[in-house]
Amino acid sequence: MNFKEASILYMEYVKNRHKKQWFSVFDYNFSKNIISYFETFNIEDLSLNDLKDWKKFISDQDFSNSYNSQLYSMLLGFLEFCSKKYNCCYEFLPDFLPFDKRIEYKKTDFYTLKEFKRFIKGFDNQLYKTFFEFMFYTGCRPGEAMAIKIRDINGNFITVNKTIDEHGKRELGTPKTYSSNRTIYISNSLKKSLNNLISSYDCMSLDYFVFGGVKPLAPTTINRYKLKACEKANIRSITLHQFRHSHATLLLNNDIDIHIISNRLGHSRVSTTLDVYTHSNFNQEKRLIKSLNSIKFNLF
């Protein structure tokens, strides 16, 4: 049996065991980086050298360590499936080792409050301007922001209990984790912007998406408007997810308790918030240096 035929059955096996949003990402990555490479191979004829050649091919793509690790786990899972389902004899599997770790420098970017105010002036369109205000001032994940409906707004509080897959068919689904279900507070100014946007719709239903009305916004269109605004404001572009980083960094730099930030972001553990966001807290670093310089050490 060739690799591609076996992969179709494997994908059905995986699909029945995971959420739609997770599977759509898995399907994309597995198809792009594994099936496309092995599609002409027969699963019975795979050798350790074939797998090593694939690892070299992937290594040459200069992906991150974490992404390489994901791809390795995907391929290993497929091989184990073939071993059980089709009795393929892969005695070499114990020698199929993970990718070697490379030294990585974190590529993290975000907008400061001053930069965001400059960025937001680049919008003429009320819908997309309000969307990015929401992203920056709530820290919601992009899929969560796109999924917000009018019924989710109650005064200064917004209920986050669903998400939209950014890479698939834009279907509504449950949030990333149980902790992602949350209620977050919004400022009066953001509430006013949201109300103005909702009032602009010709006919309004509580089941309308706040951003888009009958249908949610498309990620490609959001990015197109973002790039236009960046060009107009003469500021570098950051990813949609980095607006979430921007919000977290804004809170950290204003000395908001890490537990409150973690809950607001929908993290299941405070350690996740610390690992992901504290490296960008430059103001805290400045305070640390100032404190150290002010300390008089008694050496004797």
What are these regions (language model features)?
Residues 110, 164, 265-290:
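Catalytic-site neighborhood detector that most strongly recognizes the C-terminal catalytic loop/helix
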Residues 69, 88-91, 95-142, 146, ...:
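Basic, Lys/Arg- and aromatic-enriched nucleic-acid-binding interface segment
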Residues 78, 187-236:
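Active-site/catalytic core of tyrosine-dependent DNA strand-transfer enzymes
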Residues 3-4, 8-80, 216-221, 236-239:
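N-terminal core-binding DNA-recognition domain of tyrosine site-specific recombinases/integrases
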Residues 45-49, 80-103, 290:
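Short, charged hinge/linker segments at domain and secondary-structure junctions
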Residues 83-93, 156-159, 199-204, 300:
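Proline-centered turn/helix-capping motifs that create local helix->coil transitions or kinks
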Residues 84, 130-133, 137, 143-144, ...:
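C-terminal catalytic core of tyrosine-transesterase DNA break-rejoin enzymes
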Residues 170, 174-181, 188-190, 291-300:
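C-terminal secondary-structure termini that scaffold catalytic or DNA-interacting sites
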